[in-house]
């Protein structure tokens, strides 16, 4: 497993990961689908932004075998403490992870548009 990207949030340096488990959970929480992932930065509600960061942190911890016993409210409080710059950091990691999709996955995703 390659080393996961980490962000400083909640008083710690925490791993972030946006694999299919994280994206599946986020789609379920947000009510959005895979076809919406390409436009995620446009008109993203505040609650969806918080849940995206939450899912990335939760699954980064899972992949790193680190306990993650935090809620979305905890993550929202951390964002309050760190500022919205943390959202930009997470979006960069998210964008990088989407760039790692295979050509077949990209083609399938583009057909859904």
Residue ranges and their predicted role:
Residues 1-13, 28-47, 63-113:
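Charged interaction scaffolds used for protein-protein
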Residues 16:
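Active-site-adjacent beta-strand anchor residues
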Residues 19:
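Residue-level signal for threonine
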Residues 51-55, 59, 96:
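Short, residue-level hotspots on alpha-helical faces of the histone-fold
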């Amino acid at each position: 497993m390659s080393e996961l990207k980490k962000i400083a949030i909640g008083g710690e340096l925490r791993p972030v990961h946006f694999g299919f488990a994280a994206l599946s959970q986020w789609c379920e929480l947000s009510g959005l689908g895979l076809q919406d992932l390409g436009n995620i930065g446009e008109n993203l509600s505040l609650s969806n932004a918080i849940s995206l960061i939450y899912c990335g942190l939760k699954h980064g911890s899972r992949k790193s075998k680190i306990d993650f016993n935090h809620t979305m409210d905890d993550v929202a409080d951390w964002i309050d403490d760190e500022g919205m710059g943390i959202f930009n950091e997470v979006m960069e990691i998210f964008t990088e992870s989407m760039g790692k999709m295979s050509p077949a996955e990209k083609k399938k995703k583009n057909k859904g548009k």
